[in-house]
Each structure stands twice: as structure tokens, then as C-alpha cells.
Regions:
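Mature extracytoplasmic/periplasmic domains
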Residues: 128-133, 138-153, 167-170, 176-185, ...
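Conserved N-terminal structural module of periplasmic/extracytoplasmic solute-binding proteins
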Residues: 19, 59-66, 70-76, 83-85, ...
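Extracytoplasmic/periplasmic substrate-binding proteins
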Residues: 378-475
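Helix-loop-helix "hinge/cap" segment bordering the ligand-binding cleft or interdomain interface
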Residues: 3, 43, 288-395, 471, ...
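Beta->alpha turn/N-cap motifs
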Residues: 31, 73, 195-197, 253-258, ...
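Conserved C-terminal helix/tail region of periplasmic/extracytoplasmic solute-binding proteins
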Residues: 165, 169, 513-586
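Hinge/lid segment of periplasmic solute-binding proteins
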Residues: 254-304, 314, 450-454
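Beta-propeller fold detector
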Residues: 2-7, 50-54, 89-94, 132-139
Length: 586
């Protein structure tokens, strides 16, 4: 036996994680050394070893024709390195739904690099720049958060074989092929439109497709257009043109869209036949009237305020409006803000319900003035000059579940019991987006139930994953059934697979799952002791979720906060632009 010394592998922490025989007879070894990856290329004929250290953790990695192809973990990029000197030859931005949390299934076959992830099956010709999306798995089995992709193989007949493990730990294998003779589904096509991808939507597509094999389900994402340079207004305007031309989708995820306008114009089908038992009735019926239920939220974010001290409890419990909170908000030891965007994001949802009434198109000028005046007073009192809190960025953090899914979740930046031990704040306001995260952040610093947990004045919540079915569709019944399936997907099993951008409307599901993890044995209160379900029952009013209106208000509010324009100019600009926006909706 002959040994080939490799200096990089002599380190104590070096861990070999991959070994392949390349087509040219060379041996390609991948090793993890600390937080980086080392690639070693060995020529058996000369016993020479070439070591390449890219400076990041790359996996999986492949060698072909003098180049190393490596996926950068924690990012959405693929790097091509010169195998002789490690120089970057090419870098690709991958069409991934989320950064690679673990090695995806990948292989080099037939002069192509192919890989499979939760977005689909993709390939790049070696030495080329053209990326091909061979299967959009946002509508297929690989989209399921419970399926862990492990390997992919392309056979000589053009079949892509993908293996992995499901939620039950059972091995599964799928074959993907393009069949020119395949019959079109007899039940037609059900088209679902959403601004953004989501775990709940993916789970529903897979569940519905398995229950209705006679029908094809297609999901269209507005985010794809945003990635191609369109603005939010452009995306919504294009969708509206399609809807009113009778060429729109069948099912809508209404988040960010003018849902109130759609209801007033009578273009949404009645969802009253969907069984909403065991749900928060105050949430699921927020868009219902005596004639029917026109939109159905499947998640929601409560607008909450909470505090540690008994002193602030008394003051907060008596607050009837935003003005009543102003003195408390202005004191940094009560509510800590370092970015005016974060302040706006925490208070706007509750205020929007008063500024833009659900019942009609128009602006409540008094409510608008109150919101702008109070938030401007906080900006001045706390001397906030930056747009974003340096600790929390734009107010969104990334939570990852055991399934590797990464989803944006809003974390109240004023709650600094956990984030700022050196400069704590007694109170917090915000729109917590996950039952688990709400519990963790409420008890993490003190290990006790807060002195007060209540809705912000107005008892407002933000509807999320609000579903609607267009009554102009020829698939109305199928669309209603799809929404019903979506509600049925809110189970403890799904709740345990990742974080969500809101609370389930199915009451008690997330509480039961979180309670299994935090049962009081660690000395902290149990989730049920927070009594959040009782707080949720107090919520009565949906916030205005129209993304165009929110951006319109924020753009002008930012000018006020930075001193570029005064209050009167800000109010006048918002009123003028809102009138134009509403006129366009007619």
C-alpha cells in the first residue's frame, strides 16, 4: 500500500466527507476542515495531490474536465473553480427558494451538472452559462417540506430518478420524465396565484394533487416577476388586467392585493361552505357578511403589546388609542427602536385598519395624522436617524425548521429582553408571526409570564395567506375545494416542520405542538400559561394588507421622519396618491 501525503488532511479537525473517481481517472476528495471545505485532487499515476481551499463551506462538490463545481452552503450560488489554482472561473445564482441548508442531490452526467431541490430539477451544461429548469417542483412531490432529497441520477432514457426520505423516515424514489404521449388531465387545470412562495401553499398543492389526480395544479408566483425587475405595483396592475379581462387565475392568495376592493366589486366566490369548525371564528369570518364569506385567512399575525413591569402594565392596559401610548413609546427604556422602518412596521398594521376602512375606499385623515404624529414623536424622542435597526435589520429574521425550510418571520424589534441584555426594554409591540417564536421571545429573558399581554388599541390582526376564488373562473368548485384542503393541512405534523409567517387559524394546533417541546420541566412557564388563545379571541379587526397602500404611506412617512417634509405636506401627498390609487382600482 502506498500513501500520498496531503498537508490539509493532516489537521486534527479534518473530516473527509466525499470521495469520487472522475472520468479522467483522477480521485476527487472533499474534506471539511473547521468552517471551510478543502478539495483534494489526486493523480494516481503521478501520486501528485493538488489542494484547493475555496474559503467557504461548499457541498456537494464535483470535479470534471479541470474544474471544480461546488454549491455554497447557506447561499444560493454555485461556484466553478480552476482545479489547479482555485481561481473562480464562473459563478451562478441558482433558482433556489431558500439558501442551501444541507447538501442537495446533485450529480454530473452527460456533460451536465444536474441537481434537485425543493424548487425542482435543474441543470447547467458544463462550461456553459444556460440554466434549465427541468421540473418546477413547487407543484410536485419534491416541494413537500417533509421530503429530504438525497440523490439524483439521470439514466440513458432521459429519466431523472430522485431519492430521499419522507417525514416518517421511509425511503422514497421518484421518476421524472417528459412524456409527449401523456394524456391531459381530464379535470382541467387549476391555476393558483400567490405573490410569494410558502410552506403551507406547497403542502396544499401536494395534498390536493394526490387527492385529485384528474386535475393539474399550476402555481404562478408574483415574486418571479419581481425578480425580473417589475415593481410590486406593476405586478398587481398586471394581475388586475388579467382578472378583469377574464384571463386571471382560479385561486388567489390575496396577501398584498386590494382584497377589500375585490370584495366590493363582487369578483370573489362565496367560501361559506368550507368547514371552519375548531378555528378562530373571529379571524376566519373577518371578510364575511350576511351574504357570504368572500375571503378566508388561513394564518394571522396579532398586533400585540406586552411588558414585564406592573407599573407599565397599568398604563398599557388603559390605552385606548395610539396617542395614549405615545409617552410610553417615546422612552427608550420602555420601547427600544433604532430604526424608523422597524417602528413603522410594528405600529402600521394596527393603525392601517383605521386609516383605510374596510367598508369603503378612502382615507380617515384623523387616523392618518395620529399615526404619523405619534411615530414622528417617537423618532424625535429616541433620536432615531437610521432606517433599519442594526441588530434586527429590516425587522425580518430567518428561522429554520428541522426540515431545512427557511422562512422570513417578523420579530418585534422593540422587544429587547432577549436581544439587548445590555440595554433592555420593558415593553414590546409587534406582530409576532409564529406561536413558537412568540413563546420563546416572551419568556427567554425573564423565565416568567409577562405582566401584560394584550392587543394593541383597536384589537387589530393581520390576515395572512388569505384565500379567494374568482367567481369568473370555470373551476370555482375546485377552487373552493383547494382552499378547504389548505385549511385541513393545518395539523400538528405541519406545525412541527418549520416556522410560519403567522399563527394557524386552526385553534390549538400550534399550541399543542409547542407544548410538547416546552412542558415546564425546564423551569419556564408552559406555552398555555401565556394564555395567548384568550388574547387571540379579543381580536376583532383585520388590518389593511394592500401592499401598494403600505408602500405609499411608508415612502412619505420616511420623508417626515428624516425631516425632508413636514406633517402637512406628508398628509397631503398621501391623500393625493391614495385618491389616484383608488381611481385606478375602479
Amino acid at each position: 500500500m502506498q500513501t500520498i501525503p496531503v498537508e490539509a488532511l493532516s489537521q486534527e479537525e479534518a473530516l473527509p466527507i466525499g470521495l469520487r473517481l472522475a472520468a479522467d481517472g483522477k480521485i476527487f476528495l472533499t474534506a471539511q476542515v473547521g468552517e471551510t471545505t478543502v478539495f483534494v485532487l489526486v493523480d494516481p499515476a503521478t501520486r501528485q495531490a493538488t489542494t484547493v481551499t475555496p474559503g467557504f463551506y461548499g457541498s456537494p462538490a464535483f470535479y470534471a474536465e479541470g474544474s471544480i463545481y461546488t454549491f455554497a452552503a447557506g447561499s444560493t450560488s454555485l461556484s466553478v473553480l480552476d482545479a489547479t489554482n482555485g481561481r473562480v472561473l464562473q459563478q451562478y445564482s441558482l433558482p433556489l427558494a431558500e439558501p442551501l441548508a444541507r447538501a442537495s442531490a446533485a450529480a454530473i452526467q452527460q456533460n451536465c451538472l444536474i441537481w434537485a431541490d425543493s424548487n425542482g430539477i435543474h441543470q447547467i451544461a458544463l462550461g456553459g452559462t444556460l440554466q434549465q429548469n427541468l421540473a418546477d417542483n413547487r407543484s410536485f412531490a419534491l416541494a413537500s417540506s417533509s421530503f429530504i432529497v438525497q440523490q439524483i441520477v439521470l439514466d440513458g432514457q432521459g429519466n431523472y430518478w430522485v431519492s430521499g426520505v419522507n417525514a416518517g423516515g421511509q425511503a422514497q424514489i421518484y421518476r421524472y420524465r417528459y412524456d409527449t404521449q401523456a394524456a391531459v388531465a381530464s379535470g382541467g387545470e387549476l391555476v393558483v396565484w400567490a405573490m410569494e412562495d410558502s410552506l403551507l401553499l406547497r403542502e396544499t398543492v401536494n395534498t390536493y394533487a394526490s387527492e385529485h389526480p384528474e386535475q393539474t395544479v399550476t402555481v404562478e408566483y408574483g415574486q418571479d416577476s419581481l425578480d425580473n425587475g417589475m415593481t410590486v405595483d406593476d405586478v398587481i396592475r398586471t394581475l388586475n388586467v388579467e382578472i378583469f379581462a377574464g384571463e386571471g387565475p382560479d385561486v388567489l392568495v390575496l396577501d398584498g392585493l386590494p382584497v377589500e376592493s375585490y370584495i366590493r366589486q363582487g369578483i370573489l366566490a362565496d367560501l361559506s361552505n368550507i368547514d371552519t369548525s375548531n378555528c378562530y371564528e373571529n379571524i376566519v369570518h373577518c371578510y364575511a357578511d350576511e351574504s357570504g364569506c368572500w375571503a378566508l385567512p388561513l394564518l394571522f399575525r396579532p398586533s400585540l403589546v406586552y411588558c414585564q413591569s406592573e407599573e407599565n402594565k397599568a398604563r398599557l392596559s388603559e390605552a385606548q388609542n395610539l396617542t395614549d401610548l405615545q409617552d410610553l413609546l417615546c422612552v427608550k427604556s420602555n420601547f427600544h427602536y433604532d430604526g424608523y422602518y422597524n417602528l413603522f412596521s410594528e405600529l402600521y398594521p394596527a393603525a392601517s385598519a383605521s386609516i383605510f376602512a374596510v367598508e369603503g375606499e378612502g382615507v380617515n385623515e384623523d387616523a392618518l395624522r395620529e399615526f404619523l404624529s405619534v411615530t414622528k414623536a417617537v423618532v424625535d424622542a429616541q433620536q432615531i436617524s437610521a432606517e433599519y435597526d442594526p441588530l434586527f435589520g429590516d425587522g425580518e429574521d430567518t428561522a429554520s425548521g428541522d426540515d431545512g425550510q427557511h422562512l422570513a418571520v417578523d420579530i418585534p424589534v422593540s422587544m429587547n429582553w432577549y436581544g439587548r441584555a445590555q440595554d433592555p426594554a420593558d415593553c414590546a409591540a409587534g406582530n409576532p408571526s409564529d406561536y413558537l417564536l412568540t413563546y420563546i421571545y416572551m419568556v427567554s429573558e425573564t423565565g416568567s409570564v409577562p405582566a401584560l399581554i394584550r392587543p394593541l388599541p383597536g384589537d387589530v390582526f393581520t390576515p395572512v395567506m388569505t384565500m379567494g376564488v374568482l367567481n369568473t373562473s370555470d373551476q370555482v368548485d375546485a377552487g373552493v375545494a383547494f382552499v378547504g384542503t389548505m385549511l385541513d393541512c393545518e395539523t400538528e405534523d405541519l406545525a412541527g416542520r418549520g416556522s410560519f409567517n403567522g399563527y394557524f387559524v386552526r385553534q390549538g394546533v400550534q399550541l399543542a405542538k409547542v407544548s410538547q417541546r416546552y412542558d415546564g420541566t425546564d423551569g419556564n412557564p408552559t406555552p398555555s400559561e401565556l394564555n395567548l388563545d384568550a388574547v387571540m379571541a379579543q381580536l376583532t379587526t383585520p388590518s389593511n394588507t394592500d401592499l401598494s397602500l403600505r408602500e405609499l404611506v411608508y415612502e412619505n412617512a420616511a420623508q417626515l421622519y428624516t425631516g425632508v417634509q413636514d406633517l402637512e405636506t406628508t398628509v397631503a401627498n398621501i391623500l393625493q396618491r391614495t385618491d389616484l390609487y383608488y381611481a385606478e382600482q375602479q
